[in-house]
Amino acid sequence: MAELNSLSELSAVTNAVEVNKNIAPVHVQKLDSQGRSYATGKRKDAVARVWIKPGTGKITVNNKEFEQYFARPVLRMILRQPIVIAKRDTQYDVVATVAGGGLSGQAGAIRHGISKALTYYEPALRTILKKGGFLTRDSRVVERKKYGKAKARRSFQFSKR
């Protein structure tokens, strides 16, 4: 390649190749061969695999109805948040398999997976779900136990005498 001898030649070459950094990435619909969108969600130690397809609003978790799997109303509410906020309560069927962690972590993992799968199916919902904080992975995990301590931060009882 020929060497550029002056700054004017260099600027002419760099201006010719126009790089627009302000263009937002275009999100396209991601579907599998059966017309479903798939996403994984994580929370604490729980990992959820979530599939979304057009349907009547039925939610299945580990081959059980989600009302049967999650007995506590708070966990059901957490699970349904992204669908309710996106106003798609009765439009999609959700099938999820979740493993690891407790029920609270599993509900959070499914919520994260549903949010991601919704954005794959309908990219226009991304801004709404992003503002609600549903697409962000909650990175809080249990702090490890340290040696010389009873728990992560709790010390053994101290006696002066």
From Swiss-Prot:
Single GO cellular component term: cytosolic small ribosomal subunit
Keywords: Ribonucleoprotein, Ribosomal protein
Entry superkingdom: Bacteria
GO biological process per UniProt: translation
Organism (species): Bartonella bacilliformis (strain ATCC 35685 / KC583 / Herrer 020/F12,63)
Name of this chain's protein: Small ribosomal subunit protein uS9
Gene Ontology molecular function terms on file: RNA binding; structural constituent of ribosome
Gene name per UniProt: rpsI
Keyword Transit peptide in record: no
Pfam families: Ribosomal_S9
UniProt-listed NCBIfam families: PRK00132.1
Family, per entry: Belongs to the universal ribosomal protein uS9 family.
UniProt KW Ribonucleoprotein keyword: yes
Entry-linked Gene3D superfamilies: 3.30.230.10
PANTHER family noted in UniProt: RIBOSOMAL PROTEIN S9, SMALL RIBOSOMAL SUBUNIT PROTEIN US9M
SUPFAM superfamilies: Ribosomal protein S5 domain 2-like (SSF54211)
